[in-house]
A protein has these predicted regions:
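N-terminal intrinsically disordered, low-complexity, charge/repeat-rich segments that act as generic
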Residues: 1-21
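Glycine-rich active-site loops that engage anionic ligands at enzyme catalytic sites
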Residues: 17-149
Length: 149
């Protein structure tokens, strides 16, 4: 089981990646960890924020139905999603539907935060008013249950 630590503005949570539902995309994400970026609120999507730098994940999207693995249309608090077309990762802290100015879009369901979301959601919601913050994604070593630095 691939587990990651997600850190935002001093709060860290643990998440499990969906290796069974999106094995190729999860594998590519795992390869590019640790990853750090400034994130901003996703104003059209509801309770969600997104990365501003493209993740270095190359996928042959033509091989997947809908151009992605594990396509999902709605997100609930704690969902981690990825849009291959623009290489953007997003995390829902509330009810959300990944949207662009052109409307709602299907995204790849990558994983889910397993820890208590309250403190993390509070920091994520503040992005609307405080502006960009640093997000860090790191692998968690399953043997030691420790987050490498």
């Amino acid at each position: 089981m691939k587990t990651i630590a997600i850190e935002l503005d001093g709060v860290s949570v643990r998440a499990v990646l969906y290796e069974d539902r999106a094995p190729i995309t999860v594998g590519k994400l795992w390869e590019c960890l640790p990853f750090e970026d400034r994130v901003t609120h996703a104003k059209w999507s509801g309770g969600m924020f997104h990365t501003n730098t493209e993740l270095p994940i190359d996928l042959d999207v033509a091989r997947f139905p809908f151009g992605m693995e594990n396509p999902v249309g709605f997100q609930t608090p704690g969902d981690i999603v990825y849009l291959p077309a623009i290489r953007e990762l997003a995390i829902a802290y509330g009810e959300a539907r990944f949207s662009w100015v052109t409307g709602a879009m299907l995204v790849t369901g990558l994983g889910r935060i397993e820890d208590d979301l309250a403190a993390f959601a509070g920091k994520a919601e503040r992005l609307q008013w405080d502006g960009a913050k640093t997000l860090v994604l790191r692998r968690i070593d399953a043997r030691t249950d420790a987050t490498p630095r």
